[in-house]
Amino acid sequence: MIKRTLLAAAIFSALPAYAGLTSITAGYDFTDYSGDHGNRNLAYAELVAKVENATLLFNLSQGRRDYETEHFNATRGQGAVWYKWNNWLTTRTGIAFADNTPVFARQDFRQDINLALLPKTLFTTGYRYTKYYDDVEVDAWQGGVSLYTGPVITSYRYTHYDSSDAGGSYSNMISVRLNDPRGTGYTQLWLSRGTGAYTYDWTPETRYGSMKSVSLQRIQPLTEQLNLGLTAGKVWYDTPTDDFNGLQLAARLTWKF
């Protein structure tokens, strides 16, 4: 899995300069679930390129999900396009496909619209369609706002989910980002809570449960071109059949051109 990711990163780095390549990232993500819920390993390579008013992202991921008695492997490819139409309108369009396993969502499409209608304020709305393992489909509509106050960015997002077999649910997410006084480093905290336990790791019993999570990330510049990202988080699931939690640890290296 790691070898495939490093190979993809090597291929990406060989792209010609005229493609507008701005960064290459290689990362690893590990989640350990309590009880007999196993663990999840994910390695990925990602590139970002700039073409006039558009920013393009390409990601190739390899994942493994280990349960107590079952094991699944999967590959996922995804892409996204951010387009700046003018000074107040930006859109994000994303699509992803993966193997039909519990590791990733099989299909994922999202469309976000960002509106800078007020000074130091960004409004966001969007739609997301996801098809999980075993043909479970989820439609999600979200809306939020971000406030820019000096080095601090505070964001709130509400999401409503409509599942093909579990009905409606929701989630609330708050994030606070503190930019370093100098350089490009920053620290970001996420807090979320809701009744829609929909994640890429699709576990059937979470369809009818609730969840809450906390995650802390540090982006630390090592040189002018190389950044190190470290993330630690925890999620708690409360389901009709079992209560359990997951501990997440992640690391990534990003080279900027």
Curated annotation (Swiss-Prot):
UniProt keyword Flavoprotein present: no
Highest taxon of source: Bacteria
Name of the featured protein: Outer membrane protein YaiO
Main location: membrane
Pfam families, A to Z: YaiO (PF19413)
A single cellular component GO annotation: cell outer membrane
InterPro entries on file: YaiO (IPR016504), YaiO_beta-barrel_dom (IPR030887)
Species of the source: Escherichia coli (strain K12)
Annotated localization: Cell outer membrane
Signal peptide (from-to): 1-19
Keyword tags: Cell outer membrane, Membrane, Signal
Keyword Membrane: yes
